[in-house]
A protein has these predicted regions:
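Carbohydrate-associated surface elements
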Residues: 632, 653
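Domain-core and long-helix interface of multi-subunit machines
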Residues: 4-33, 102-239
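Nucleotide-activated donor-binding/catalytic signature segment of Leloir-type glycosyltransferases, i.e.
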Residues: 722-742
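Short hydrophobic beta-strand element within catalytic cores of glycosyltransferases
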Residues: 776-779
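Aromatic "clamp/platform" in nucleotide-sugar-dependent glycosyltransferases that forms part
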Residues: 759
Length: 888
């Protein structure tokens, strides 16, 4: 409609006349659906460029009548009616527009039976020809894919795909853009309504026994509206049509445009954040009015329960909602009060541990507006929605840091105090976040109906994957694997994004050091600012980064991800899982590290190991799918109650070109002081206690007693390095520190034997990289690496933590001919198992699982069979069977 004069109308709007609601959240907070004044709303809509004005209050026309009584031009009567399917009690919302008061009264009387109500409206429309000067009526279903009663999908009275099919027969017009619903939902609704054809309508008519309305019922009118309840977003979403030549548009012109399908939609989409902010605004308005009912001035209703806000909280929100009406003297006075509160808070700092949550909340709210940087951000935020989110998220972060500091500064911390502080920390964040949590839960409850409708109408869905991880910038196997996954997703055209967390103080340095900017620029990496960083107990160099939960939730929902892969069960992984549950999106998690074994290795406390196992089991039972690195881990989880049907083995391998015998340089290790002719045993990986490097050290010392012509090279770094250097003092040992890129490839190919004694590794990049480089390997019989080699063909698999077993294998590999034979077999093994498309278990798990089922023809009982044999039968493994060695 560009270039021609048009008329706009916000076709979904509420005032304080919407005083009855079936929304649980609003009833919980004991607030009405709206405090918006009709006359103020009219002025705002006109300022927003609306040529026609109406209100669609729930089952009421009292608000719009105030506009009519004030003789305001361009106003017409509408109402959003709660109408019922009589066959099962399901309620939907139907807007009837441009009515008379008498017509509204009859529509209101008949709305308990949707069919009777619509029959009456159609009868009135049929009689319009007899009174051409009278009003013409339009009607449409609002937010078609939203349940109006908050009933779980499948419960009696809940909205179903059958109701949607009936609505497509009953309504000649539907609302396809709602200002409180997400872009993805609005676009799906628009696609559903505009893609109908004659064949589909006839099929639905035969199925439900309903005569479709209209001459061409597969062609629908479309409308849009803000669905504003709070006064924040009035006129930001609208319906638009061409204005008549030479005069102003009338409500009848709008109705004609709807009937002739000449309307267009425009304006903003919304989402849970929009709904949450409306709730915050309603709470603020309720507090400001002191419990008075909408439309009653300052008269209070003693029966009405209202949520009260503390002074600083109210002052904070006043700067958000009423900043334009706040005078200079009020701002000066407020700043003085905040300064005094800040000084008082500093005096109370020593007694912080004894302060109640309400006092801390008030302190932080007061301190927030004393923060110059925060006030600058607040002033720069153009939209009210942005200002509210900034206030709430900033408040949550301050409270979280306050409680963490209480825990850090405590001189002693017994179990009861620890539990008390933990509960306070969780409860405070839930309390401040409650409007958001309720809103996200409310809107995500419609996901199942959307999926059902998508299936009914055979609409494909664009798959959009997100991976959340606690580690990306560290040098470890998990981080390297994730980077490979990003590159593979890009190569295959998979929509894949990684989300992680960094503190502002470390962001610039870490990103530059990790060469991660290219991932950020391409949109494949999203870094959220951590609220606080904590050192992991007993694990040097490992940081626990606490993510901003609301920011994560908002980003995930607005991005429209269809599945979440949780890479690590840490703080970000937990936050991701909670967000996915709220958003009701599919979840999968990888099992990257044997965390319980790490706990036991570092603490030597079996009770803590048992506690870690309970946590891991709880976490992995909470996801829909578990991607494991090896059959060893699959059996381990299976023994702890994990169903076979949830388990997939991750299909990944090694870059056989980057790691290759061609990179060998004969004198490479001589540069590090290794004598010419010495047999070089190589270890590559983290130098940590959990890697069983004490076993490696003891074995090397033992071997040296017989063979002085050996040398041990350790590539990597970690918290156990100093202790290991002391343990091996005087021995021919080289510590290189971290090596990367070409230098690492050369280091592998130029060594003689790869040692990997770890019993806790779930996968083992290093043993594969060594075999690809033409080296025989020695691994333990515990963990994933044993599955990445062939015993006595590409190396040796020895009993874990057995020094003499490791010495025996090392002694055998001092034979040059044996080393060459096994090294060649190792390279052949890597070549034979190369993958054209790795990581399908994550990037395309549905196809991966289906391909596996066809190949293995798994019996149904295997899915729950607890025997180890059933695990082997059920699990998909892309690798060549290790039972035969003929190929090598």
């Amino acid at each position: 409609m560009t270039g021609k004069r048009t008329t706009k109308v916000d076709f979904h709007l509420h005032s304080y006349a919407s005083n009855v609601t079936d929304y649980y959240a609003v009833n919980t907070f004991a607030i009405p659906e709206s405090y918006s004044d009709p006359l103020a709303t009219y002025r705002e809509l006109r300022a927003q460029g609306m040529g026609l004005v109406t209100l669609t209050d729930h089952n009421s026309i009292d608000g719009v009548k105030e506009m009519l009584d004030a003789h305001l031009p361009g106003v017409f009567i509408s109402s959003e009616m709660t109408a019922t399917f009589p066959e099962d009690g399901c309620n939907i919302h139907v807007t009837v527009a441009n009515m008379t008061e008498a017509q509204f009264a009859e529509v209101n009387r008949l709305r308990s039976n949707l069919y009777e109500m619509l029959d009456y409206v159609e009868t009135e429309i049929a009689q319009e020809a007899n009174a051409k000067a009278g009003n013409r009526i339009a009607y449409f279903m609002t937010h078609p894919l939203m349940s109006t009663q908050n009933r779980p999908y499948g419960r009696e009275g809940a909205l179903t795909a059958d109701h949607i099919e009936k609505a497509l027969l009953l309504f000649p017009c539907l609302e396809v853009r709602n200002g409180t619903r997400t872009r993805s939902l609005n676009e799906f609704t628009h696609r559903l309504v505009t893609s109908l054809d004659r064949e589909t309508i006839e099929r639905l008519a035969n199925k439900h026994g309903i005569v479709p309305r209209g001459r061409t019922p597969w062609l629908k009118g479309i409308v849009a509206g803000s669905d504003d309840h709070s006064g924040i977003n009035q006129g930001r979403t609208w319906t638009e049509f061409l204005s008549p030549e030479g005069r102003e548009s009338t409500p009848n012109d709008l109705v004609d445009a709807i009937r002739n399908r000449r309307t267009a939609i425009g304006g903003e989409h919304g989402g849970p954040v929009t709904l949450a902010h409306a709730m915050v605004k309603l709470l603020y308005d309720g507090h400001r009015k002191g419990g008075a009912q909408p439309g009653q001035g300052t008269q209070k209703n003693p029966a009405q329960r209202t949520v009260r806000m503390g002074g600083p909280i109210h002052e904070l929100l006043r700067f958000v909602f009423d900043s334009q009406s706040t005078s200079v003297w009020q701002k000066v006075g407020f700043q003085a009060r905040m300064t005094l509160k800040k000084l008082a808070s500093m005096r109370r700092k020593g007694r912080d541990a004894d302060r109640a949550f309400e006092a801390i909340l008030a302190d932080e709210a007061a301190a927030l507006l004393s923060d110059v940087e925060f006030r600058r951000k607040l002033a720069d935020a153009a939209r009210t929605d942005d200002r509210i989110f900034l206030v709430v998220s900033s408040l949550i972060h301050r409270i979280f840091r306050r409680y963490v500091e209480r825990l850090r500064s405590a001189q002693s911390l017994d179990l009861i105090r620890l539990v008390k502080e933990g509960v306070a920390l969780a409860a405070s964040n839930v309390f401040v976040s409650l409007p958001y949590l309720v809103s996200y839960l409310h809107q995500s409850s419609d996901r199942q109906i959307v999926e059902d409708v998508r299936s009914r109408f055979d609409f494909g869905e664009h798959k959009k994957l997100v991976l959340v991880t606690d580690t990306f910038f560290e040098i470890n196997g998990v981080a390297r694997t994730i980077r490979k996954m990003i590159d593979e997703a890009k190569r295959r055209g998979v929509d894949f994004t990684v989300v992680t967390c960094l503190h502002d103080s470390e962001r610039a340095e870490v990103i530059a050091a990790a060469d991660a900017q290219r991932y950020i620029d391409s949109g494949q990496l999203r870094i959220l600012p951590s609220i606080v960083n904590l050192d992991f107990p007993e694990y040097q160099g490992l940081q626990i980064r606490i993510p901003p939960f609301l920011d994560l939730l908002k980003y995930l929902q607005e991005s429209g991800f269809t599945k979440m892969q949780i890479s690590t069960p840490g703080a970000i992984g937990i936050a991701g899982l909670m967000a996915a549950k709220l958003l009701q999106i599919e979840t999968s998690s990888t099992y990257p590290t044997s965390f319980p074994e790490y706990v036991e290795n570092y603490t030597r406390d079996v009770s803590l190991e048992a506690l870690a196992w309970k946590y891991m089991c709880l976490f992995y039972h909470s996801v829909d799918e578990v991607v494991v690195p090896s059959k060893f881990i699959a059996r381990l989880l299976h023994q702890r109650g994990m169903r076979n049907r949830k388990l997939l083995i991750l299909d990944r391998w090694v870059d056989a070109d980057r790691f290759h015998p061609k990179h060998k340089i004969d004198d490479f290790w001589q540069r590090y002081g290794v004598p010419e002719g010495a047999t070089t045993f190589l270890y590559v990986g983290r130098i940590g206690l959990e890697k069983n490097l004490d076993t490696l050290a003891d074995a090397f010392v033992e071997l040296r007693k017989e063979r002085p012509d050996v040398h041990l090279a350790l590539v990597g770094d970690g918290p156990y390095r100093k202790a290991l250097e002391a343990k091996l003092a005087g021995e021919p040992v080289t510590f290189t520190g971290f090596l990367e890129g070409q230098e690492l490839s050369i280091a592998y190919a130029s060594a003689d034997v790869k040692l990997f004694p770890s019993t806790t590794d779930t996968w083992g990049n290093a043993p594969l990289e060594a075999q690809a480089s033409g080296l025989p390997v020695v691994v333990s019989d515990q963990g994933g690496p044993q599955e990445l080699m062939v015993h006595e063909v590409t190396g040796y698999c020895v009993k874990g933590r057995e020094v003499h077993a490791l010495v025996d294998a090392m002694h055998k590999l001092l034979d040059l001919d044996r080393r060459k034979r096994m090294g060649a077999a190792a390279r052949a093994f890597v070549e034979q198992n190369k993958l054209a498309e790795p990581f399908s278990a994550i990037l395309d798990s549905d196809s991966y699982r289906e391909r596996f089922k066809k190949n293995k023809k798994v019996a149904q009982h295997d899915e729950d069979d607890r025997s180890p044999e059933a695990v082997d039968r059920y699990l998909v493994d892309h690798r060549v069977s290790h039972a035969t060695t003929e190929a090598f």
